[in-house]
């Protein structure tokens, strides 16, 4: 685990974005941890979040021309990541996002920001069922751009309804790499360092045994 990944876990714990306990997911599964990126909700939170996303992007080595944030949660993520890339990595790249409803006046169209072209890096909070990615792919393909990759904050590394995860489905269907700031494996490595979190470690390991990929 890299220093920025450990820092991100601690940031998420401090903001109660990441919690350990017992939680029922939309799928009906009982999970020993929960991640709610919507709780990164202040100016400082967003500034820090962008730095973590930018760090993961640079670390990945994936080449891309533009950041795309799917409405709605991807919008602030794309914005703050673009700022962090410019300020901390000297990479001044364009970004854009989609509207849920196309306007028929003013700017018009369903996109805001830069023209959607070239190699697109899609940024979002998490991938649960992959629906937002599929909707975004329709937009990207309609503009004759290509998907360079997808970056999310957390990869839960668990099976969907079949034998593979929603992330693995996206990688298979679109031939792109999905990267994340942290994975379930990183969470477990972090818990292994914390003696006072032994009960959570056992629960997360058991969950991975049952649902992991």
UniProtKB/Swiss-Prot annotation:
Pathway: Pyrimidine metabolism; UMP biosynthesis via de novo pathway; UMP from orotate: step 1/2. 5-phospho-alpha-D-ribose 1-diphosphate binds at residues 26, 72-73, 99-100, 103, 105, 124-132. CDD domains: PRTases_typeI. GO terms for cellular component: cytoplasm. It catalyses: orotidine 5'-phosphate + diphosphate = orotate + 5-phospho-alpha-D-ribose 1-diphosphate. It is an enzyme of class 2 (transferase). Its cofactor is Mg(2+). Its EC number is 2.4.2.10. Orotate binds at residues 34-35, 128, 156. One of its GO terms (molecular function) is magnesium ion binding. One of its GO terms (biological process) is pyrimidine ribonucleoside biosynthetic process. Keywords: Glycosyltransferase, Magnesium, Pyrimidine biosynthesis, Transferase. Disulfide bonds: none annotated. InterPro entries: OPRT, Or_phspho_trans_dom, PRibTrfase_dom, PRTase-like. Homodimer. Belongs to the purine/pyrimidine phosphoribosyltransferase family. PyrE subfamily. Catalyzes the transfer of a ribosyl phosphate group from 5-phosphoribose 1-diphosphate to orotate, leading to the formation of orotidine monophosphate (OMP). This is Orotate phosphoribosyltransferase.
